[in-house]
Amino acid sequence: QEENKNFSEVGIQTHTESLKDSLNYFTKELQFDVVNPASDESLDLTKDKLSSYDGLIWGGSSLNIYNDTPEIRKQIDFMKECQKKVKKILAICWGMQVAVTAAGGEIKKADGSHIGIASEITINDAGLNHPIYKGKDIKFNSPAFNFDEVKTLPNNAICLASNKINKVQSTYFEVND
């Protein structure tokens, strides 16, 4: 919540606003509900209707999951609910850290960082066969501000891409109850 306020006060889009604009650039057919699980007062109402969503996109944040604050624990708990009730989840950056942690994986401070761009992300064999990378060049760059990385993947998770800084730039896994 404070991070969003700080962005807005200096005229910068929040992560959520930027993500919505990016998606709307490609299609106007999506409908969005925005939830901030760290501070949303009506989170219990949102949990009740999770299974009605076609999918969920969980974007970035400047938080570090290993700091284990009440705000972070609330997000992990909400992600666990999402993993039970939402069939398709695209978890980007911080979202991947929350999803991996909620599913039993572990995040640590990375040995390096991405400031603005994650360079030379390389899709591995598993990634080349995954629909998210259909038609994508085997090496690519992506916008990123990242200081942390996946240390341990959840059970049944597959790494899809990596680079020199992060051994896991992308992963796929299913959560079973």
Residue ranges and their predicted role:
Residues 105-177:
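Pocket-forming structural segment of enzyme catalytic cores
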